[in-house]
Regions:
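Hydrophobic residues positioned within well-ordered beta-strands of beta-sheet architectures
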Residues: 32-34, 85, 108
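Short beta-strand segments
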Residues: 16-50, 69
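A structural signal for short, well-ordered beta-strand segments
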Residues: 36, 87-89, 112
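Short, basic/aromatic recognition patches
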Residues: 1-19
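Short beta-strand segments in beta-sandwich/barrel cores
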Residues: 18, 67, 89-90, 114-117
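C-terminal edge-of-domain segments
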Residues: 80, 94-132
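Short, structured beta-strand-loop surface elements
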Residues: 51-106
């Protein structure tokens, strides 16, 4: 059984771009726009890139194993949706090409520990926060 609700999974699978926040060895935050996919076999978010293994975000994850991932959009006239996933992150040397053809083999994998979801496109609006 997934840690994500049906509505959250539908939202994740409708999006292609997210924002990954990590912290370097000095405690400085870094955020990057990233391409991702939901991995149903592991119930994780997998993040890839063309040169993922040589990025600051990859080094940050390898260093401390922490990340926050955000997907958001706004539908007209002003209906925002957001999904934040906080969790354990792994810097892996294989699997990146499963996110998108042509990506490097290096992969960042996030296993959710906390999920925060808001969807104002439905009536009544949905808002939830939970540890998983």
């Amino acid at each position: 059984m997934s840690k994500f609700t049906e509505a959250e999974l539908e939202y994740i699978q409708s999006q292609r771009l997210g924002r990954l926040a990590t912290v370097n060895k000095n405690g400085d935050p870094q955020v990057a726009a990233v391409t991702f996919r939901y991995n149903p076999e592991l119930d994780t978010i997998d993040i890839g890139g063309y040169d993922n293994g040589n990025t600051q975000k990859f080094r940050n994850v390898a260093l401390n194993g922490k990340a926050s991932f955000l997907i958001d959009d706004v539908l007209p006239p002003w209906k925002p949706r957001t999904l934040e996933i906080r969790g354990h992150a792994e810097a892996l040397s294989e699997g990146g090409e499963t996110v998108r053809s042509g990506f490097s083999p290096h992969l960042i994998r996030i296993t959710p520990r906390r999920i925060i979801f808001a969807d104002t496109t439905v009536d009544p609006p949905q808002h939830s926060k939970r540890n998983v």
